[in-house]
Each structure stands twice: as C-alpha cells, then as structure tokens.
Amino acid sequence: MLAPSPISGQANEHLVLFGDIVYFYPPGHAKNCLLNNQFKRGEPVGFRMNAVNPTTGKRDRATELVIHMNYAGKTVDVPMRDRQNEKQPEREFWVAKWVVPDDAPTGIIRYTVTAKDPHGRTGEFKPFDVQASQLTIVP
C-alpha cells in the first residue's frame, strides 16, 4: 500500500482504519473466516481490522484497537489483539471475537472501532450507514 502524500500544512495525525466482519469458528470449520453480517445468538462474530499511519503507509503493532458495540441500551467494549505471529507473518491485522450473547436483541448492532498508536495518533472506523450491510442479529 502506498502512503498518501501530505498536503502542505496538513498534519497526518489520524490513523486510517479499515476491516470486515466474518464468522470466527475454529480452524477447519467450513464457515470459519467467511464474510458475513447476519449472526444468530451463540454464533462467533470475528472482527478483522487494520490501522495504518497515513504518513508511512505502515501499521504499528503496538497500536491499541477497541470495538465499541451498542445494543440493549448498553455499550460493550471489546479489545482487539494483533493477529501477526512468527508462524503467520502475513497476517498484518488485528482481530477480536464476540460470541452473540443470549440477551442480544434481534436487529442491527451499531459498532465503531477506535485506535490509538504509541505516538498519540488516533483513528475511528464506522461501517457504512447502509442497513442491509450492518452487523445484524437474526432469529
């Protein structure tokens, strides 16, 4: 990925965040890592995100990412972890697993993801505001 060139006088103080949601079943399961946005209670939602410094075009593995989900009148914060390791160095992203709880109402679950790197840069991800593509709990 190429880093964008800063405009004169413009500070690159915000991280660029992007990602997706998938099923997070154990390895070998037919639906593991399959893109999806509709989940039933008890199913594992996988959040995969990246946070990039716009100046360098690179990520800092020490960056902290947190998912903030709003449902049933409460906000649930889920910290993400760096997925990259010695056996899988190509996995340059963060992950978090959230099993849909029994008290989650059916319908859209609104969420955002925030990030902060060791240098104080921050960023926020919000999914497109299109109902058909939102994280949705189904019966």
Describe the function of each predicted region.
Residues 4-46, 51-54, 136-139:
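Short, compositionally biased P/S/T/A/G/V-rich stretches that sit at domain boundaries
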Residues 35-37, 81-87, 99-102:
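Beta-strand-rich interaction surfaces with strong enrichment in secreted/lumenal proteins
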Residues 42-44, 62, 106-110:
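Extracellular Ig-like/FN3 beta-sandwich strand-entry sites
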Residues 51, 98-100, 115:
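Hydrophobic beta-strand positions in extracellular immunoglobulin-like domains
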Residues 51-79:
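Short flexible loop/turn segments that cap and initiate beta-strands
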Residues 55, 118-122:
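Short, solvent-exposed loop/turn segments at the edges of extracellular beta-sandwich modules
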Residues 86-98, 105-109:
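Aromatic sugar-binding surface patches on proteins
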Residues 121-139:
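Short beta-strand elements
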